[in-house]
Design a protein with these regions (language model features):
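Hydrophobic membrane-targeting alpha-helices
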Residues: 16, 57, 155-156
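A generic, lipid-embedded transmembrane alpha helix
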Residues: 44-60
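Physicochemical signature of membrane-embedded alpha-helices that form the seven-helix bundle of GPCRs
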Residues: 7-10, 48, 77, 144
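Hydrophobic transmembrane alpha-helical segments in integral membrane proteins
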Residues: 1-13
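N-terminal signal-anchor/start-transfer transmembrane helix
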Residues: 10-23
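Short, hydrophobic transmembrane alpha-helix segments
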Residues: 1, 58-65
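Cytosolic-biased juxtamembrane loops and peripheral soluble domains of multi-pass membrane proteins
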Residues: 22-41, 64-168
Length: 168
């Protein structure tokens, strides 16, 4: 139970930190005329993403967390995913928010992880979920969370691509 509680605290502290960054960036973007597409799934993601962690950590707290070896594998995946996410945030700078906000006359970011992939932040999100699922031995909520968030991310990517003029 202590491991689950500690994991919960780490996840919450990092989420709050990310939310603060997002809100600051959002204010600047809105003040400078950034456009938000109407069909975004932000509201749904705002609930599903944190509830996924609550569910996985609760499952781990109730039924026991993973063995030390699997916990370490999960922690390594989680930390690697967070590193990728913060690299993506640093590369996007003020453009990174939880919402899809497109600045006026913006050019594509092609530095950092964006040199190799279009949406590294979402790869990181799936990595975060996988890492916590492994740490918590959350077989049920982990699978449900990864599939559910994966479907939302797929929709979100299509919204972002249309908003940025990248239709594939």
């Amino acid at each position: 139970m202590q491991v689950a509680l500690l994991t919960f605290l780490v996840v919450v502290v990092v989420m709050v930190f990310e939310a603060i960054i997002s809100r600051r960036h959002e204010k600047v973007l809105r003040d400078t005329g950034a456009i938000e597409p109407a069909e975004d799934v932000y509201v749904l993601m705002q609930a599903v993403y944190p509830l996924s962690f609550v569910g996985m950590i609760t499952e781990g707290g109730l039924f026991g967390v993973a063995s030390y070896s699997w916990w370490m594998v999960g922690a390594a995946i989680f930390l690697t995913a967070k590193a990728l996410k913060f690299w993506a945030i640093a590369s996007l700078g003020i453009r990174w928010t939880f919402r899809v906000l497109v600045p006026i006359n913006a050019s594509f970011v092609q530095s950092g992880p964006y040199r190799w992939v279009l949406h590294p932040n979402y790869i990181a999100v799936i990595g975060e979920l996988l890492g916590v699922a492994l740490m918590m031995k959350a077989l049920v909520t982990g699978v449900i969370s990864i599939i559910g968030c994966g479907l939302l991310i797929a929709k979100r990517i299509s919204v972002e691509n249309r908003a940025l003029g990248r239709i594939r």
